[in-house]
A protein has these predicted regions:
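Short, well-formed alpha-helical segments that are part of the catalytic scaffolds
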Residues: 8-28, 41-44
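Hydrophobic targeting segments
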Residues: 2-8, 31-34
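A structural signal for short, well-ordered beta-strand segments and their strand-loop junctions
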Residues: 34, 80-84, 137-142, 205-209
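Conserved catalytic core of nucleotide-sugar-dependent glycosyltransferases
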Residues: 90-189
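C-terminal catalytic/acceptor-binding lobe
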Residues: 4-5, 12, 16, 20, ...
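Active-site-proximal specificity loops/subdomain of glycosyltransferases
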Residues: 35-83, 88-108
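Short beta-strand/turn micro-motifs composed of small residues
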Residues: 8-10, 36-38, 140, 243
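Short, solvent-exposed loop/turn segments at secondary-structure junctions
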Residues: 12-14, 62, 86-89, 144-147, ...
């Protein structure tokens, strides 16, 4: 077995871990390990974290003192796949036979989506296929709070059922290849993920021209990208979308905390905003055309928001 795989489960479900390990061993393909990322356990037992769990999932990204240590740990593994089976925006149900059923997004996404690969092993296989074809080390279906060595690979993030579709689709692989070929890593525009990306890559200003670009929904989906909100606050996905629609005509500013993009430098505010420059054209991926077209219809009467 020449493929060293690590799978990270989000909670300490021993039955699930046992089932997963049994399935992985049956493939006879991977020298695999299963770790837990139990944020709740960490919060309650901060001092005992290292005694109970092999990977310090949260500390490694949010506390600088532990960043280097965690980075060294991750560098030992060829493939990293995280399975966040219990987070707010998406509900996964693991059946006894290892099948995964994906329920609808809570809140904005009303369409019911189901996973196109039926079981856990297929998910992992699909993830590894994407990583192999795109030279990616880690796939995380939610927020990748992983420090990493950019010389060893790129962190790629998404959630199931986003506009790009499933992990093992050619569309997703196309997106990965595009992101990598342009020195982009695919991250959400919410929380502090962009800030984290800039930190681990040593990016201090927008002059570096290496930016986190989201091809997923980010914090806002298409239903929220409307003229009436004046585009005051944008997710990274929104910004990429607008740049594709109106190349070079948009002005974007990143908030100092790294988690909000503004469409213009607002007046009457003391907030420090960093200008963002897009120097790459962002393609429309298969499956996104209908969203672009719908957005274009919405924008016909309000192009002033785009500084045209």
């Amino acid at each position: 077995m020449d493929k060293h795989l690590i799978v990270v489960l989000s909670h300490r479900d021993f039955k699930k871990k046992s089932l997963l390990m049994e399935n992985l061993k049956s493939t006879e393909k991977y020298d695999a390990e299963v770790w837990y990322q139990d944020e709740g356990f960490y919060n309650r037992n901060k001092d005992k974290w290292h005694e109970s769990v092999h990977v310090n999932y949260q500390e490694g990204s949010t506390q600088g003192d532990n960043r280097e240590h965690s980075m060294k740990n991750w560098a030992n593994y060829k493939y990293i796949v995280t399975i966040d089976d219990d987070f707010k925006s998406l509900k996964k149900v693991f059946n006894e036979d290892g099948k995964i059923t994906l329920e609808k997004y809570s809140g904005k996404m009303v369409e019911r989506r189901k996973n196109s690969f039926n079981n856990l092993i297929e998910f992992i296989e699909g993830s590894i296929m994407a990583m192999e074809e795109s030279d990616i080390r880690l796939i995380a279906p939610q927020k990748p709070y992983f420090p990493y060595d950019p010389n060893k690979g790129i962190v790629v993030q998404s959630a199931y059922g986003t506009a790009l579709g499933v992990w093992n689709s050619s569309t997703a692989i196309t997106a990965f290849k595009y992101a990598l070929s342009n020195n982009y890593t695919r991250l959400h525009g919410d929380d502090n993920i962009l800030n984290e990306f800039m930190y681990v890559n040593g990016i201090t200003t927008a002059e570096d021209k290496r930016y986190a670009v989201s091809f997923g929904w980010g914090k806002d989906d298409v239903s929220s990208i409307r003229p009436q909100n004046t585009f005051d606050k944008l997710s990274l996905y929104d910004s990429v979308l607008l740049e594709h629609l109106f190349p070079g005509r948009n002005k974007y500013f990143l908030s100092k905390n790294g988690n909000t993009i503004h469409s213009h430098k607002r007046k009457n505010t003391d907030e420090e905003l960093i200008p963002i420059i897009f120097d790459k054209k962002v393609p429309v991926f298969p499956g996104l055309e209908k969203y672009y077209n719908a957005l274009m219809e919405d924008l016909k009467d309000d192009r002033r928001s785009f500084h045209i």
